[in-house]
C-alpha cells in the first residue's frame, strides 16, 4: 500500500503532496511528489483544480505501483481543500492534529530519519523535497526566545535549479518548507506504523 500526505497552500503558498510506500527491502520511500506553487503566476489554481490534480496524482501512483492507498493525510487546519476533495470524490482526507509545538513535530520526523529506514527516490519531482530538506532551519531569534519556529521565507531557486513538476505541470521559482511540512504530517499520522510509537 501507499500513503499520501498534503500540505495545502493558499494564494501565495505552495501545495505539496508526498507519496510514500514501504519497499520489499524494509525501507520507507518517498516515491513521488506533487508540487504546485502559485508564486509568479497571474492566474492561480482554484481549490477545485488542486483537488483534481491531487486525485489524478493518487490515481497515477496507484497505477504505477500496482497497489492500494492506506492513509491520506492533511493538515487539520486546512478546510477548503479537504471539503473540496470530499465533495468531488467522496474521500475524507485524514486531518492530522499538528498541535501547537512545532518542535515536537520536527522531533518525530528526525527520530524517523534517525532509524535509517527512509529513502528518497531520485527523480525530478522529488528534487524539491531534497532542496527544502537541506535548507530547513529554525529562525535564529525564535531559538533564542525558547520557542523555535521554522523559517518559512520563500527563497528564490537558482536559475540552474529551475524546478518543473510533471504532476502539476508547472514550474516553481521559489522554495520554502512545504514538502517538509507534509512529511512531518505523514510521520505524525503514522507513528505506530513507522515504529515510533507502540
Model-derived segments and spans:
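Mg2+-dependent endonuclease catalytic cores in nucleic-acid-processing enzymes, primarily RNase H-like
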Residues: 18, 25-172, 193
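Two-metal-ion RNase H-like nuclease active-site motif
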Residues: 1-11, 75
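Short, hydrophobic/amphipathic alpha-helical patches that form generic packing surfaces
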Residues: 161, 181-189
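Short, charged alpha-helical segments
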Residues: 156, 174-184
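Coil-to-beta-strand transition motifs
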Residues: 10-14, 26
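Acidic two-metal-ion nuclease catalytic site recognized across multiple nuclease folds
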Residues: 186-198
Amino acid at each position: 500500500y501507499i500513503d499520501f500526505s498534503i500540505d495545502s497552500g493558499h494564494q501565495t503558498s505552495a501545495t505539496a503532496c508526498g507519496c510514500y510506500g514501504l519497499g520489499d527491502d524494509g525501507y520507507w520511500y518517498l516515491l513521488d511528489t506533487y508540487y504546485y506553487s502559485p508564486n509568479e503566476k497571474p492566474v492561480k489554481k482554484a481549490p477545485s483544480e488542486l483537488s483534481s490534480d491531487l486525485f489524478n496524482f493518487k490515481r497515477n501512483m496507484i497505477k504505477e505501483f500496482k497497489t492500494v492507498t492506506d492513509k491520506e493525510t492533511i493538515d487539520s487546519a486546512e478546510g477548503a481543500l479537504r471539503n473540496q476533495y470530499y465533495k468531488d470524490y467522496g474521500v475524507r482526507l485524514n486531518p492530522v492534529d499538528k498541535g501547537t509545538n512545532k518542535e515536537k513535530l520536527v522531533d518525530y520526523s528526525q527520530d524517523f530519519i534517525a532509524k535509517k529506514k527512509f529513502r528518497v527516490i531520485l527523480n525530478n519531482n522529488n528534487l524539491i523535497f531534497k532542496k527544502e530538506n537541506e535548507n530547513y532551519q529554525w529562525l535564529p531569534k525564535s531559538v533564542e526566545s525558547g520557542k523555535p519556529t521554522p523559517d518559512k521565507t520563500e527563497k528564490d531557486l537558482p536559475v540552474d535549479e529551475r524546478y518543473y513538476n510533471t504532476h502539476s505541470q508547472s514550474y516553481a521559482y521559489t522554495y520554502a518548507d512545504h514538502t517538509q511540512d507534509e512529511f512531518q504530517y505523514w510521520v505524525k499520522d503514522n507513528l505506530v506504523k513507522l515504529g515510533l510509537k507502540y
